[in-house]
């Protein structure tokens, strides 16, 4: 066990939208400390989203936030061992973990898409998530389905 709980690091807002959520997303997107490249990919993806949805009254940032909300899980299952048997126990997810999972899933499924540049793949995944489709949305639905199937074990609290 550690002595004290580690302090939360302050994440500075991004330069364009002045939003902490964007900075956090870019940090997840980043490889090898190349944050500028990550920002370029993210902003290019938002430009692509705006170009492909011209008649949408929302801004590209609002579309991205809605897409993130659509892929954010509310419950997850955790393994709990009780008397020799392992149960999948559904548990609520902390708000900061919800955000982190949704960002990581969106990026993971964007990377899994074939071909094109990362900006295009990310834009496509954002649009799919906005329309409640795509891999990241399916992952969230699967998590909820697993939790629902194992609802009988919800009384095994952690």
Swiss-Prot record:
GO CC terms: small ribosomal subunit
Signal peptide start and end residues: none
CDD domains to which the protein is assigned, alphabetical: uS7_Bacteria
Gene Ontology biological process terms, A to Z: translation
Keyword Flavoprotein part of the UniProt annotation: no
Protein's UniProt keywords contain Heme: no
SUPFAM superfamilies: Ribosomal protein S7 (SSF47973)
Keywords: Ribonucleoprotein, Ribosomal protein, RNA-binding, rRNA-binding, tRNA-binding
Molecular function (Gene Ontology), one example: structural constituent of ribosome
Domain of life per record: Bacteria
Family to which the UniProt record says this protein belongs: Belongs to the universal ribosomal protein uS7 family.
Record note on quaternary structure: Part of the 30S ribosomal subunit. Contacts proteins S9 and S11.
NCBIfam families cross-referenced by the UniProt entry: rpsG_bact
Job description of the protein: One of the primary rRNA binding proteins, it binds directly to 16S rRNA where it nucleates assembly of the head domain of the 30S subunit. Is located at the subunit interface close to the decoding center, probably blocks exit of the E-site tRNA.
Name of the protein in question: Small ribosomal subunit protein uS7
Organism the protein comes from: Bacteroides fragilis (strain ATCC 25285 / DSM 2151 / CCUG 4856 / JCM 11019 / LMG 10263 / NCTC 9343 / Onslow / VPI 2553 / EN-2)
């Amino acid at each position: 066990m550690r002595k004290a709980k580690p302090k939360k690091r302050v994440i500075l807002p991004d330069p364009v939208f002045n939003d902490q959520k964007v900075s956090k997303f870019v940090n997840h997107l980043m490889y090898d400390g190349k944050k500028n490249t990550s920002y370029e990919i993210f902003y290019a993806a938002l430009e692509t989203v705006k170009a492909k949805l011209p008649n949408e009254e929302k801004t590209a940032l609002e579309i991205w936030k809605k897409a993130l909300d659509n892929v954010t899980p509310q419950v997850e299952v955790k393994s709990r061992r009780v008397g020799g048997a392992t149960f999948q126990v559904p548990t609520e997810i902390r708000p900061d973990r919800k955000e982190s999972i949704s960002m990581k899933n969106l990026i993971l499924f964007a990377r899994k898409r074939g071909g094109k540049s990362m900006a295009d793949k990310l834009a496509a995944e954002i649009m799919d998530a906005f329309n409640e489709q795509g891999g990241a949305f399916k992952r969230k639905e699967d998590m909820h389905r697993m939790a629902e199937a194992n609802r009988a074990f919800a009384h095994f609290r952690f």
